[in-house]
Amino acid sequence: MIRVLLIDDHEMVRMGLAAFLEAQPDIEVIGEASDGSEGVRLAVELSPDVILMDLVMEGMDGIEATKQICRELSDPKIIVLTSFIDDDKVYPVIEAGALSYLLKTSKAAEIADAIRAASKGEPKLESKVAGKVLSRLRHSGENALPHESLTKRELEILCLIAEGKTNKEIGEELFITIKTVKTHITNILSKLDVSDRTQAAVYAHRNHLVN
């Protein structure tokens, strides 16, 4: 049986969820909490397999409750079940440790399936939320600094260039041939989008890559 804890400040929501879930052959509701602080206490006390978490509640909200539960328990499986898909709700609770994010407009069977998936460590995201997360990942990639694409070896060579080392000195320090050094430098210049080693050195200092 999958042991589930419900955390929601609306009694009717908890009653409806509990009635549906208890009718499932493989799911058991082991506790209900009406706010975040009570939810944290019950989560620690009962160690449920899966937690259904509302976000907007009086007192401690779902984001803070998720943070605290993730600090107290090892790898808790938290499914957010809410009416909100605002950025200031979605990202903080996922970053806090929530595994899945569903809307209260989801079909009952979808919630049950998400619970079963969560018990195996498999996430389920409402399609609009998945779109938001993917968009954010794409944008974070677009905003990445050029040197973040350098390999460890290329970063080493960039730092040595910034220290004023010649190709020969770099090769001797890293035990590689001058030809290999030149190949790495060509790649470095391309990735940093600079035209020569002087500009590469300036970039390294500007981005605090060398002391």
Swiss-Prot record:
GO terms for molecular function: DNA binding. One of its GO terms (cellular component) is cytoplasm. Pfam families: GerE, Response_reg. Phosphorylated by LiaS. Induction: Autoregulated. Induced by antibiotics (vancomycin, bacitracin, nisin and ramoplanin), cationic antimicrobial peptides (human LL-37 and porcine PG-1), Triton X-100 and severe secretion stress. The keyword Endoplasmic reticulum does not apply. Residues 167-186 bind DNA. Residues 143-208 form the HTH luxR-type domain. One of its GO terms (biological process) is regulation of DNA-templated transcription. Keywords: Activator, Cytoplasm, DNA-binding, Phosphoprotein, Transcription, Transcription regulation, Two-component regulatory system. Signal peptide: none annotated. It is found in: Cytoplasm. It comes from the Bacteria. Residues 3-119 form the Response regulatory domain. InterPro entries: CheY-like_superfamily (IPR011006), Sig_transdc_resp-reg_C-effctor (IPR016032), Sig_transdc_resp-reg_receiver (IPR001789), Tscrpt_reg_LuxR_C (IPR000792), WalR-like (IPR039420). Gene3D superfamilies: 3.40.50.2300. Member of the two-component regulatory system LiaS/LiaR probably involved in response to a subset of cell wall-active antibiotics that interfere with the lipid II cycle in the cytoplasmic membrane (bacitracin, nisin, ramoplanin and vancomycin). Also seems to be involved in response to cationic antimicrobial peptides and secretion stress. LiaR regulates the transcription of the liaIHGFSR operon. This is Transcriptional regulatory protein LiaR. It comes from Bacillus subtilis (strain 168).
